[in-house]
Amino acid sequence: NMIFEQLFDTKSSTYTYILSSGKGREALIIDPVLEHTDQYINFLNKLELKLVKVIDTHIHADHITGLNELSERTNCTKIMGENSKSEVVDLRVKEDENVKIDNINLKVMYTPGHTDCSYSYLMNDRVFTGDTLLINGTGRTDFQNGNARQQYDSIFNKLLKLPENTIVYPAHDYNGKKPVSYTHLTLPTKALV
């Protein structure tokens, strides 16, 4: 049974995702927050998961990534898109490449706009959009080499062209109305048009 965990950091309003094909298998984390590293490690240990890959959808301005700490503690591979200027990355991925663990496959989509290094990751009927597309809005484009035209193109010509039942999993919910226990902030793409 696939493990799919969505965690929320109230301080930075960040969503982190833990994926695995099942108990005792390999795991992958998307957009980890440094302060929650122990929580992630405990979750992994409880389910006997081996963290092999960790992804940041882009360079985050609102929180410190947990990439380095997780890599130091688990020896996992740190992944970002090829346009990332981060110097701590082990593997840079590009459009249409795949990030795989066991039988889970994430297709890489370059979705600039919020930043020039924003990437989304498509997993079957789910898409992890980072800050490019949020549930009730989009990420800012006025800093970090953001570009409103690119953002529009990424949203309307890539993300919203996915099948309409594709579920959007963003990196943030800035409304701040969701308690930590509210664990599935999502919408199908058809509801966002």
Report the location of each language-model feature:
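Conserved beta-strand hairpin/beta-sheet module of binuclear metal-dependent hydrolase folds
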Residues: 2-50, 120-130, 136
